[in-house]
Amino acid sequence: MTFSKTRNKIIFLLFLIIINIFNINAYIKDENEDDLSLLISTLDGNIYSFNYESGELNWDLKPNGGDSLYSTSQFDRKQQQSTSTSTEITKSSPSILIPTLDGSGLLFQYSNDRLHQVPFSLQELVNTSPLFLKELEDKSSTSSTSTTSESSKDENKVTMFIGNKKTSITVVDSQTGEIIKSMSKDGLWLTDEDDCPVNIIPDEALMFTRSDYQIIALDPKSGVEKWNLSVGEYIPHSTKSFYNSEISLNFEGLIEVASLSQRMYKIYIKKPEKTVVGISHNYWEHILTSSPVSIYAYSSKKHILKKLDFHRKVSPYSNSLIPVASTDLMIPSNFDRTFMFDDYYGQLFIVSPPSNNNNNNNNNNNNNNNNNNNNNNNNNNNNNNNNNNKNNNNNNKNESDKSNLTPLTPYDPSKPNGANNNNNNNNDLLDSNKLKNYDIYLYSSIVILITSIIVFIRSKKNFNLINVNNNNNQNNNQNSNQNNNINNKKTPKKKKKKQKNKNNKNNNDEDDENEIENYNDNQNDLIDEFISTNSVIQQQQQQQQQLINSSNKINNGSGKIILDNGNVKIGKLEIITNKILGTGSCGTIVYEGKMEGRKVAVKRMLSQFVKFADREVSILIHSDEHTNVVRYYAKEEDDEFIYLAISFCQKSLDMYVQQTLSLQISPTDSPSIQSSNNNGNGNNGNNNNNNQIIIDNKTKQMILELFKGLEHLHSLNIVHRDIKPHNVLIDPNNRVKISDMGLGKLLDNDDQSLTFTSDSHGWQPAEYLNGTNRNTKKVDIFSLGCVVYYLLTGAHPFGHRYNREKNVLKGKFDIDQIKHLPDIHQLVHSMIQFEPEKRPDIGECINHPFFWEVHKKLSFLVAASDYLEFEKPTSPLNLEIDSHVDLVTDGSGDWWLKIDQVLIDNIGRYRKYNGKSIRDLLRVIRNKFNHYRDLSPEEQTCLGILPDGFFNYFDLKFPQLFIVTYLFILKNLKNDQYFVQYYY
């Protein structure tokens, strides 16, 4: 009876708890049903309002025509000066000014591969206009000012800055997005009403103020404009004074913006689980046509109007929009870049300056009361603040930044709930006090529920145990004695040292205790073994160090000291003679060594080749600051040899490839040469071989690093002339480095070719071998193309060792092993052309689509389809691209034969497509991409997820389609404004 009553009470308690939890969920759901929305302003001047819970678009508008928030003439001027790639454009002189678009107004000057922060913000330049500044020096980040009456010797370098600020106002209905009233930048209201806007707008209205800061750089002598730059920002305001909420907000969700292409940005909103109780989906996403600049949370019911932080995800190749040279080449391979760049139709801007990378969001949250109160003051009195002097601006700059802006912090996907690297969250959209009560109530209920279940199970177990071991109508004393008898039974695993607590535990407790004791004993044994092993290792290290320190040094009279351990000490270098890293021509040997405690590679060369060593040292000094060129540390010499201390590398590229071939490492470890028994291309028809080369990201990165290293040498007018697998090294961080520039030569400014013969044959082009003295930078392009093919296949494109030179002179090569990889096949094919003028330069190699991300390739195909759509079907362009239909369809001549039936049933439903037209195939890709969300689940499953799965579907069906389209646009429309972003 006792157990029955207890069980009934527990069941009743569980019933109450379950009802209570449902009430909590309903309460939270009711609280979440509000008008919370996200206000997003984009770089093209648009404003969007999304419902925070559902992700539905409430409205979008273009105030004042939707002019872009950023424009500059700097990059147009540079494109006129150079027709090279975008990387080369930014390198050319003079320097350029790059703004940040986070509202801080910070400006950075890019000059000679360096970024310097300008000591004046954009607002300060406008407020102090006119301003006379000297151009920044190459190695300095400071600028000096002068008045109009000053004159100096560097008068030609002085630039006059004229600035102005224009403000416009747009009053919007926050529910519908309808523009109620607006004021232009000239101060004119664009409605017929004469009332003050505060008197005519409803309570639910929002007022967007747009401030545009423009600076114009002029030549003070001639008055000619050098360039101009304009940056604007939208700031929303509410007409309700109580929107300055004093509640500290803690947004634990994630707002992430991913750059898909120049015209496509995906905004991803992930909401925290506790704010969406009972809802299966806690995230949503949208594609925007321009980069988001600011995001605000707005709710009229909760009186929220707060600027939110969001994380940006930029492709690694997007960071190469502007090269920033490293000042320390010994950095780890997984370092994070300080700056994140993006561009708007070729105009660079910074989305994440270093000042925002380490900010702590807790400061923003903890000081929210004061900051919120200061927000409207700063915004409403912006014009008054602009009239302050320069000193006041400098003193108040940090405070205003903190009050108006939440910092952009890099997103770490390894941390839960989108927390940033500082373990801090963004601003919350819920009342933290209410949320705290929800948590306490919910968590306490769960704890009670779990505790009740445990009590119920243990009570039932004890009750059954008593029934088995007692007769009916036994009294409490008998029950107690019986329980003691059961507990006094010993188990085989019971240990004696727990005897004193034996009577207070049942058999199950004893088993658990034994397992814990056995586990602890095993852990103690492992710890003892580790301590013992560690002591032995430390003892061996101490003995080795004592042996080195106490060794008797023998001086052989030539500046060389032989240590007792057999190592050779010469100058600052210690050479480990029994560790040979490699050998070279002319008696060259590379040893492992040490220099001032740093592990280095020591290259020993015969003194008679000192001329080559001096040339190599000179080139290494010039290329000292690049991660993909071997770094020079020191040079020592004795009577016989010259010793060069260079970056320590574990192996050469030749050793790497040979080890991969001999070991046949698994696909996860072997990045370049692998077998594939399943080509996974369906009816593709192009990859039918069982053994095919597979290229993963590691191999692609190695090839890119090779190109980057050569790009650095060529930027210094250095021609290597001896690029081969033996002269490409791999360091402990798996970075590729170009070495052995002993045969290189530094070209003079007016000298574009050189005449010098090398003993390394088989990797040089025909013009080098036949002695025509046309050895320009294209020599290195040819050699690098051969090295890339060797990295991928382990073979040489011009055949076996003894036939290579003959085949090179004939222009006879075979690269069919990578024919199933059209991108890299076309790149290598162009690099090893017989005629030097047909080979690309190193900038074109780096910008080749082989290195493009999937989303960029997909964007390119869509752009090509957009352009060809406006051409007549019989136009020369459409006729030319359609002539490649046999190549694209692998000889079938009709792309309909390769499309899956589920797509065929849908494609022909709306319009007719010609299976013999490449233009129509591109149209299919464009339409399916633009209407992907409208496709049926079967079609989405067939095509795969955007963008990777979608692109791979068509790439596997038509592996030649992309490269054919790329070469077609390259030939006919390369300089068209529609495609210039892809080629420069």
Curated annotation (Swiss-Prot):
Catalysed transformations (reactions): L-seryl-[protein] + ATP = O-phospho-L-seryl-[protein] + ADP + H(+); L-threonyl-[protein] + ATP = O-phospho-L-threonyl-[protein] + ADP + H(+)
Stretches of the chain forming a coiled coil according to its record: 467-533
Residues reported to bind ATP: L581, G582, T583, G584, S585, C586, G587, T588, I589, K603
Top-level EC class: transferase
Compositionally biased region (Acidic residues): 509-518
Disulphide bridges: none
Location in or out of the cell: Membrane
Record field: compositional bias (Basic residues): 490-503
UniProt keyword Protein biosynthesis present: no
Membrane topology: Single-pass type I membrane protein
Domain Protein kinase residue range list: 575-851
Keyword Protein biosynthesis: no
Side Cytoplasmic, residues: 458-984
EC number annotated for this UniProt entry: 2.7.11.1
Membrane-traversing stretches: 437-457
One Pfam family in the UniProt entry: Ribonuc_2-5A
Lineage top rank: taxon: Eukaryota
Alphabetical UniProt keywords: ATP-binding, Coiled coil, Glycoprotein, Kinase, Membrane, Nucleotide-binding, Serine/threonine-protein kinase, Signal, Transferase, Transmembrane, Transmembrane helix
Annotated ranges, domain KEN: 854-984
Gene Ontology cellular component list: endoplasmic reticulum; endoplasmic reticulum membrane; IRE1-TRAF2-ASK1 complex
Residues making up the signal peptide according to the UniProt record: 1-26
Protein's recorded name: Probable serine/threonine-protein kinase ireA
Source organism per UniProt: Dictyostelium discoideum
